[in-house]
């Protein structure tokens, strides 16, 4: 059997809210993500709990990864990054393929931005090895991101076999595409958009 291709989508959910936090958008997000038909979803700023907002009639009690996972009938894994007394959010990986959670690594470099790397594996049909999926959310400031590139590279070098197929996806907060160059050089990875479009 020849290996089946895998499609992925990465999306920052903004904690399930619209711009300026005016409207709850979780169900619309679930519909839009479902319409894409991707095998694996890499999601950032996923609300796990928000006790204050859940008092609103339009804000769901259930974690947003469960709402989307139930809507699409996907397996799911959630890693808390930012934890407060009455709320928490983080990264999530959802998959139509069987999903195994390996680790949730704190890659925060300051007190203002709590960031993480969620490590899961999926086994696509016909593949010999599991596909390693790393979902990340990186800082806004470039000097902070440089530290986080090193943390990601160190983690991959330590825990991921060199022959393993690997996808690193997420919100890199990187408008100048330095993450692709830095991580590509350090880990011998290709940037999918550059491969597909040449830019």
What name fits each language-model region?
Residues 1-71, 83-85, 129, 150-151:
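N-terminal, active-site-proximal structural segment of metallo-dependent hydrolase catalytic domains
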Residues 40, 142-199:
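Metal-dependent phosphoesterases centered on the DNase I-like endonuclease/exonuclease/phosphatase
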């Amino acid at each position: 059997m020849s290996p089946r291709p895998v499609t992925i989508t990465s999306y920052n959910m903004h904690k399930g809210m619209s711009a300026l936090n005016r409207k709850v958008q979780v169900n619309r997000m679930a519909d839009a993500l479902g319409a894409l038909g991707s095998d694996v979803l890499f999601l950032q700023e996923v609300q796990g709990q928000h006790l204050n907002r859940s008092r609103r009639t339009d804000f769901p009690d259930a974690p947003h990864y469960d709402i989307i996972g139930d809507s699409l009938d996907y397996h799911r894994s959630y890693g808390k990054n930012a934890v407060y007394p009455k709320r928490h959010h983080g990264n999530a990986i959802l998959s139509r393929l069987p999903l195994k959670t390996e680790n949730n690594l704190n890659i925060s470099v300051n007190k203002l931005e709590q960031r993480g790397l969620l490590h899961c594996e999926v086994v696509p049909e016909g593949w010999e090895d599991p596909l390693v999926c790393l979902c990340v959310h990186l800082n806004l400031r470039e000097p902070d991101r440089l530290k986080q590139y090193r943390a990601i590279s160190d983690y991959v070098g330590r825990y991921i076999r060199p022959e393993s197929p690997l996808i690193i996806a997420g919100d890199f907060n990187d408008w100048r595409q330095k993450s692709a160059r830095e991580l590509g050089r350090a880990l011998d990875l290709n940037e999918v958009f550059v491969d597909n479009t040449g830019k």
